[in-house]
Amino acid sequence: MTRVKRGYVARKRRKNIFTLTSGFQGAHSKLFRTANQQGMRALASSYRDRNRRKRDLRRLWITRINAAARNNGISYNKLIQNLYQNQILLNRKMLAQIALLDTNCFSTIMKKINE
């Protein structure tokens, strides 16, 4: 059987890892073993946090809507319930943006709901 030296393949594999970890500090970007571990950890963290971001943003939207609704004298629960009963199709992201940027429009929505 012929001998295979793997020079190019191994170099290419290491180069890919080092490009992934190029901005990391110290040995995490210089030594292959630690760079490999940190690269895998970074990818796992980014996967986890992409899903966590969705959760966190939804919580933020609900908090903002609740604050704006309480300024208008109604709780968040009642607001969402009245939105569904009146068949107003505004999701939480849109409501939070309206509450934050255009309070007059949000007040108009509240009046429409309370009729």
Curated annotation (Swiss-Prot):
Entries under Pfam families matching the protein: Ribosomal_L20 (PF00453)
One Gene Ontology molecular-function label: structural constituent of ribosome
Subcellular location: Plastid, Chloroplast
Protein name as annotated: Large ribosomal subunit protein bL20c
Superkingdom as given in the UniProt entry: Eukaryota
Key word Hydrolase present: no
Family (UniProt): Belongs to the bacterial ribosomal protein bL20 family.
Chain's role: Binds directly to 23S ribosomal RNA and is necessary for the in vitro assembly process of the 50S ribosomal subunit. It is not involved in the protein synthesizing functions of that subunit.
GO biological process, one term: translation
Main location: plastid
Keyword annotations: Chloroplast, Plastid, Ribonucleoprotein, Ribosomal protein, RNA-binding, rRNA-binding
Organism field: Physcomitrium patens
A GO cellular component annotation in the UniProt record: ribosome
